[in-house]
Amino acid sequence: MRWWRRFDAKEVARDFTRVRGTGADIVRFFLLWEDFQPEPFTVSDEALSHLRTVADVASRSQLQVIPTLFTGHMSGANFIPEWALGGTRERARFRVIAGERVVDRGIRNWYADEDIARAQVTLARECARALAGHPALWGWDLGNENSNCCVPATRDEGLRWLDRVADAIRSVDGGCHLTIGIHLEDLEEDRRIGPAEAGRVSDVLSMHGYPIYASWSAGPMDEAFVAFLAAITRWLGGKDVLFTELGAPTQDGDPDAERQSGAMLLGEDDARSYLSAAMRGLQQTGATGALTWCFADYASTIWNEPPLDQAPHERHFGLWRADGSPKPGAAALAESSAKTRVEPEPVPWSEELRDHFYDSPKTTLVRMYRERRGLKGAKPPQRLARPLL
């Protein structure tokens, strides 16, 4: 979470060796926004140097990388530079963290605020310049679940932002891939920057999904859930899908997590079973690949810090434990890495339905899922409790 400030290339090499040992070939990581851009038009030379080092280590480890810009949203909180904040918050769902402390300020909407958008263009261009042509670079992720920070007022506003950031990257590196991390709530609600808008600049679409966060899933081990989201995303956006976040938090004797989030936590063997089945479903539905969230559990020394203090289940999503030992889920990653992609099958949904999907997105989404699973007349699944983040 704060690795850029406490950067250790040897730790990166150790962790990449573990990842590569499963057969995985790509790693996605976050560029904590305030670490890379301490002032609106100042990009940290030290952070860019660390970024190049990470790419070099990845290349030696035979891994490719997807750096994620403007992070932004992570583990149930929004990490935002002080200069990108303004005013007071209006009943915001997620806490805002700036300078390692929770602040009671709102986020300036970068889709509408020209100064923030220009600063983001600067960051995107300079980061892309730093890795232009690097053999380890797969491409750039234009944000992690950006709609958890702010949303455009109109589709055109969102499209203008996407075009500007994409153009900034491609002005210095025309050969890299682009994507942007959208998530379940971008399907459940019309946030005006969903799959169709993302598809305008993305080489492949990215989707994130967890059955624990959907009241309409069949439960925390609903292995069909992520494959359905991938199919919906491809249908709405018209491009192939790389599923860049799936996973499950596991039981670890953490009393806070058990008390606040017990219904979300799986035993480690159950988590492996879920991951194996979910990744198999993604492969069978034609996804270009799948990335798990996340590499390792958070060390207990930072459990009392935001956001982990109020979202204890976020401490335990790792495929490796905090001490570096692998959970059974790491074996699921190894099994899936050996599989080859299949071509997506045609979906049964009409163009007319697609054109009107966002008239009533959540109702439509739930109905489509229940029909896909043959649950049209079945009793709705019991709602899972979700902790306040």
Task: Identify what each model region corresponds to.
Residues 1-202, 299-302:
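Active-site mouth of glycoside hydrolases
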Residues 4-6, 104-116, 262-273, 317-322:
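A short acidic, glycine-rich active-site loop
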Residues 30, 144-155, 204-218, 229-275, ...:
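Active-site clefts of carbohydrate-active enzymes
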Residues 48-51, 158-162, 225-226, 271-275, ...:
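Amphipathic alpha-helical segments in well-structured domains
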Residues 89-103, 282, 293-389:
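Aromatic-rich peripheral "rim/lid" segments of glycoside hydrolase catalytic domains that contact
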Residues 125-129, 229-230, 279:
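Generic structural signal for well-ordered alpha-helical scaffold segments
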Residues 156-167, 171-258, 283, 288:
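Glycoside hydrolase catalytic-domain groove-lining segments
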Residues 278, 285-288, 295:
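Long, C-terminal catalytic modules of enzymes
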